[in-house]
From Swiss-Prot:
HAMAP family: Formyl_trans. One of its GO terms (molecular function) is methionyl-tRNA formyltransferase activity. It comes from Brucella melitensis biotype 2 (strain ATCC 23457). This is Methionyl-tRNA formyltransferase. Its EC number is 2.1.2.9. Keywords: Protein biosynthesis, Transferase. PROSITE patterns: GART. It catalyses: L-methionyl-tRNA(fMet) + (6R)-10-formyltetrahydrofolate = N-formyl-L-methionyl-tRNA(fMet) + (6S)-5,6,7,8-tetrahydrofolate + H(+). NCBIfam families: fmt (TIGR00460). It comes from the Bacteria.
Length: 306
């Protein structure tokens, strides 16, 4: 079976690796173009999928768009049986969707139709969802609207971070995709339309959302911290030894106590919220590495959180 793989971030890599490992012929990898990196943006960094594909000698294509006739002709010339799409980052026009003999299949990190869109992992945690999952669906022209082929649910534990859920769903996605490809080869892959009710959209995370608002209930603050960990990272300003610093908050738990929002309630970094309190568990100063709260506080005095 001739496969074109389309993906960009680290999340996609285990799925690409599994497809290669199970003997499928990956004839091309499509990924986002290299992006500027470094302090001055003078270096170009290739995506994780780009790096992995080159390790296996797979031709890599990095178009900025697939809307043009030339790019669509190149894609069609690959004569793929199927295209596998996992967090690629570009919308696929009808000409691309129709080119593979068996269609295009997407690995999506939510229980559709909940959390269609760009940031399903973060949004599920930030909303306080108790479960999510991984789904394989056949793509159509809508945004994550196609019929579902396979799904697996995953519980979201109370202190689970987006990073932990990301890794779990990526591995589940690899297993599901291999099962889906096998069923596709056997012509036994059943498709079920998505439910019409329960549709929500997982908008891309805005930088403004990363600043913690201590006037919100503790549950919401906690969900924001873990939903934005490790990237882009929730943050606040702290008065440390008399100077105000910006600090990233990577882990937290629900705490006990109450007070004016932002009040430091004890020497374990329990912070009062609009309702209840949150205990900060892992913090990161600018230019430093994430540290457990006890280590972060060594020799430091936090008097105020803004």
């Amino acid at each position: 079976m001739r496969v074109v793989f389309m993906g960009t971030p680290e999340f996609s890599v285990p799925i690409l690796t599994a497809i290669i490992g199970h003997g499928y012929e990956v004839v091309a990898a499509y990924t986002q173009p290299p992006r500027p990196a470094g302090r001055r943006g003078l270096e170009l960094t290739r995506s994780p999928v780009h790096e992995k594909a080159e390790q296996f000698g797979i031709p890599v294509f990095t178009p900025k768009s697939l809307k043009g006739a030339e790019e669509q002709d190149v894609f069609a010339s690959l004569k793929a049986d199927v295209a596998i799409v996992v967090a690629y980052g570009l919308l696929l026009p009808k000409a691309i969707l129709d080119a593979p003999r068996l269609g295009c299949y997407n690995g999506h990190a939510s229980l559709l139709p909940r959390w269609r869109g760009a940031a399903p992992i973060q949004r599920a945690i930030m909303a306080g969802d108790a479960e999510t999952g991984m789904m394989i669906m056949k793509m159509d022209e809508g945004l994550d609207t196609g019929p579902v082929a396979m799904a697996e649910k995953v519980a979201i534990t109370p202190d689970m971070t987006a990073g932990e859920l990301h890794d779990r769903l990526s591995m589940i996605g690899a297993d599901l995709m291999i099962r889906a490809l096998g069923a596709l080869e056997r012509e036994s892959l059943a498709l079920q339309p998505q439910a019409e009710e329960g549709v929500t959209y997982a908008a891309k995370i805005d930088k403004a959302e990363a600043r913690i608002d201590w006037s919100k209930p503790a549950k919401d603050v906690h969900n924001s911290i873990r939903g934005l960990s490790p990237f882009p990272g929730a943050w606040c300003e702290m008065e440390i030894n008399g100077a105000v610093e910006r600090v990233k908050l990577q882990r937290s738990t629900l705490g006990e106590g109450s007070g004016a929002p932002g009040t430091v309630l004890d020497d374990r970094l329990t912070i009062a919220c609009g309702e209840g309190a949150v205990r900060l568990a892992t913090l990161q100063r600018s230019g430093g590495k994430p540290l457990p709260a006890q280590e972060f506080l060594r020799g430091q005095r936090v008097t105020k959180v803004l």
